Amino acid sequence: MVDAAVMSRGRKVGAKRQKAVDPGFLLLPLLVLLLLVFVAPTLWFFFNSLRETGQSLPEVMRAIQSVLFSSTIRDAIIKTNWISLVVTLVALVIAYPIAYAMSRSRGLALTLMVICIVLPYFTSIIVRTYSWMVILGRNGLVNEVLLQLGLISSPLQLMYNTSGVVIGMTYVLLPYLVLTLYASMKSIDDRLLHAARSLGASGFYTFRRIYLPLTLHGVFSGCLIVFILSIGFFITPALMGGPQDMMIAMLIEREVELTLNWPLASIMSLFLLAITLVLYAVYYRFSNLQKMMG
């Protein structure tokens, strides 16, 4: 009896200690890792580039400010956000029915669908991008099929423009959204849908009032992931886009490799990092609201 009482008291003390631990402390190792991997190298890059210029900080900042407010940078920022938004919306339209089909599949069908989604990630992104360049070229598969069907009289220009960038980026980023939506849809209790149908609700009404609201958290999370990855994309826009499709990552590469303007490149890198942190803060706030609302 005494041993049982001591063990029970020990469990209660252990439980109190566990409750007393702030969950924020559990994130400290991850935050330290992120600071060392992302923030510290960017800051080092910025201050080291300032030291190599031999100019004072105010002089460099004035020069950078004049460049940042130039039409080139402004157009790149607008273009980056616009392409990222279009890619996110197109990926959502394609990913939602795919994720829904996966959530309703079982056995071999589900396994094959997951393999088709994940398998491309075992191939280099450069190889996948070049594959799409071959498919979308003037003599590529798409134009050949359309010409054979008589739908077009001359090959379409699907490469080296915004359309090519959107197609290539959507293909690369689509699995992120599909898997996020699949996880969200898989957690929905099917009994809710059966109950709605048994009470006389139509399939469309059940989807609109029950199924879709329950998947909005996954939609928001997946779209945020795709948008964040899109704003920092480099390889696909560089290979499949044209001169008018200059994105922020491509400008950073140009400033580092061609003009050797490292301070400006580091400022734009910090700008990208700030956008990412803001978007993650929005997602964190949204997640907390979802938990509070049940």
Can you say where each PLM-predicted feature lies in the sequence?
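Short, Lys/Arg-rich, polar N-terminal cytosolic tail immediately upstream
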Residues: 1-19
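Membrane-water interface segments at the C-terminal ends of transmembrane alpha-helices
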Residues: 19-54, 70-186, 210-234, 239-241, ...
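Polytopic alpha-helical membrane proteins, predominantly small-molecule transporters/carriers
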Residues: 57-58, 200-202, 207
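Short hydrophobic, aromatic-rich alpha-helical segments embedded in or entering the lipid bilayer
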Residues: 55-69, 144, 243-255
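Short cytosolic juxtamembrane segments of multi-pass membrane proteins
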Residues: 286-294
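Glycine/proline-centered hinge or cleavage motifs at structural transition points of membrane proteins
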Residues: 199-200, 213
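Short glycine/proline-centered loop/turn elements that form peptide/ligand docking sites
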Residues: 188-192, 292
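The alpha-helix within a helix-turn-helix
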Residues: 196
